[in-house]
Design a protein with these regions (language model features):
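Conserved beta-hairpin
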Residues: 39-55, 60
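Terminal substrate-recognition subdomain of acyl/acetyltransferases
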Residues: 103, 126-150
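Conserved catalytic-core motifs of GNAT/GCN5-like acyltransferases
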Residues: 95-99, 114-132
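Conserved acetyl-CoA-binding loop-helix of GNAT-fold acetyltransferases
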Residues: 70-72, 76-90, 100
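Helix-adjacent hinge/juxtasegments
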Residues: 55-62, 66-71, 77
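Conserved GNAT-fold acetyl-CoA-binding loop/helix
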Residues: 1, 5-32
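Alpha-helix C-terminal capping segments
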Residues: 37-38, 57-60, 83-92
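Conserved active-site tyrosine of GNAT-family acetyltransferases
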Residues: 108, 113
């Protein structure tokens, strides 16, 4: 949870108000609830040479990418790209979707996602602008995509 909070406070602060950042980073979750929320078909953790966690991501079996966070100290090192690629390799889906922050939208465009629409998310009564983005499977053909889905 520390990496999540630190990333929100240091990276997302340029695109959201101080109040939004405080609510987002301070959103109370029990440690048990946090761990349980990663019980999706694919949850990945990136570590550095010292085995320190520098990023994490998870995706549901329908291709919904729920979370992608990379340590503020490891932004622009390819960690996020490798996590997304690994998720997409492990989850065979005709399309991938994610609700992404204002800050993350340019990154997702670089890995092939397109903006579907602007969205409003809420934590309690605090509103956050984000975007629903999607990407079609880059399977070579429909029969291969169908084979991957079975």
């Amino acid at each position: 949870m520390a990496l999540f909070r630190d990333t929100v406070q240091k990276i997302n602060a340029k695109d959201y108000t101080a109040d939004q950042i405080a609510v987002w980073a301070g959103h109370e979750r029990s440690l048990a609830a946090w761990h349980a929320s990663f019980m999706k078909p694919v949850a990945l953790v990136a570590v550095d040479e010292a085995e320190i966690i520098i990023g994490f991501a998870d995706m549901a079996s329908d291709g919904y990418l729920d979370r992608l966070y990379v340590s503020a100290a490891h932004q622009r090192e390819g960690v996020g790209k490798r996590l997304v690629a690994a998720l997409e390799q492990r989850v065979a889906s005709p399309q991938y979707k994610a609700y992404v922050s204002i800050t993350a939208q340019p990154f997702f465009k670089t890995v092939g996602y397109s903006t579907i629409r602007e969205h409003r998310a809420f934590i309690g009564t605090t509103s956050f602008r984000n975007y629903l983005m999607g990407k079609r499977c880059e399977c070579e053909s429909d029969w291969l995509r169908a084979a991957l889905m079975t």
